[in-house]
Amino acid sequence: PNTKSIDGENTSKDGFFTYVNGFIKEKLSLGGSAAIKITEFSWNKDLYELIQRFEYWTVFCTSVNTSSSEGFLIGVNYLGPYCDRAIVDGNIMHANYIFWRNSTIMALSHNSVLDTPKFKCRCNNALIVNLKEKELNEMVIGLLKKGKLLIRNNGKLLNFGNHLVNVP
């Protein structure tokens, strides 16, 4: 018997992922972190490719519901255009995740991704600075990779407020 109703191929979705990807590219500080929920049928090719532009990234499954395809793409220390690693195609990344998820027997757990020994995220008291693009050098990129530095994007005007209507 079928357990899921599937109406076509399982392809990359846009929807809200367009906004998540835009936020990471345009507003997330260099050195910042992100966690985005994905499932077998709710995923995005570009997001998989973007998450590889973090110094450390993984897909984390909570195992609370072992029959679920839910996972979280975790990215730590965003490098953006300063990432020098090869980027794997997002469709291949998702296929690998689904294969791994469907072939791995998981025991129930409630562990946090931050509790796992291999997770490289530590509290580092990162310094937050404004730097121009021309001021980024190998030393600065090294500090980003180690989580010692956050660089605000001071080239864009960001306007946030708590009002739904702007009144002159």
From Swiss-Prot:
One of its GO terms (biological process) is viral translational frameshifting. PROSITE patterns: NIV_2_O_MTASE. It comes from the Viruses. The keyword Methyltransferase applies. Signal peptide: none annotated. Residues 1-165 form the Nidovirus-type SAM-dependent 2'-O-MTase domain. Pfam families: CoV_Methyltr_2 (PF06460). InterPro entries: NIV_2_O_MTASE (IPR046438), NSP16_CoV-like (IPR009461), SAM-dependent_MTases_sf (IPR029063). One of its GO terms (molecular function) is mRNA (nucleoside-2'-O-)-methyltransferase activity. The replicase polyprotein of coronaviruses is a multifunctional protein: it contains the activities necessary for the transcription of negative stranded RNA, leader RNA, subgenomic mRNAs and progeny virion RNA as well as proteinases responsible for the cleavage of the polyprotein into functional products. This is Replicase polyprotein 1ab. It comes from Canine coronavirus (strain Insavc-1). The lineage of its organism: Viruses, Riboviria, Orthornavirae, Pisuviricota, Pisoniviricetes.
